Amino acid sequence: SLGAVTAALTLAFQNQEVVCETPVTNKMTTVTRKPDISKLDLNVLDDCKAPMRTRMETYVKWLQYQLVTAMQEEENAVNHGEIPAEFIVERWIRKEGGEGVSCVIQNGATFEKGGANVSVVYGKLPPQAIRQMSADHGNLLERVGYQTEGPDAEVDGLPFFATGLSVVIHPKNPMSPTSHFNYRYFELMHPEKLKNGSPNPRYDPNEPAAWWFGGGA
């Protein structure tokens, strides 16, 4: 998860830190053995009219559930006298906006250690973070089209949304390979109001100002 860290919200989407103005405070809320997907609407996965942020959040949560279920079944299938381990699933809430689910298994008969972690975070990126992000993403600021700093600043930051799934699996068998992959999605949105308090004519809750996917394996 993102952890209760400092004013640095790590958007690993750029393999760097993007500094936010407010501290990140997470609270662990529940501990279970499986992620809860009872509120997921899987129909949005194939709905091209649904917002991509909704589809991607649903996808990473559903994939996490499938992976944890399959790994637990594999762990339970041991037949050489060892006691299978169980996943510990912790759900956390980010006070500044967002949530996550961390699933960890360790010291098992099949898996030495494994984790499948989902993060869904949102809030406002300050101008400094937007400028840093723009430098690494092909003049993003110019493409978004807002003046963010100086006396003529139109906005004092931009709303953002980020979600992703990160998975690391270390089998107990030294002949079995370690697996590591992550899927990520990030978007910047048009603010509802400009810095001077007037309505933003470009605001559309379903049309991000910029978005991209990331990840690797």
Segments (PLM) and residue ranges:
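Terminal signal-anchor or tail-anchor transmembrane helices
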Residues: 1-21
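Generic ordered-secondary-structure signal
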Residues: 4-10, 26, 64, 70-74, ...
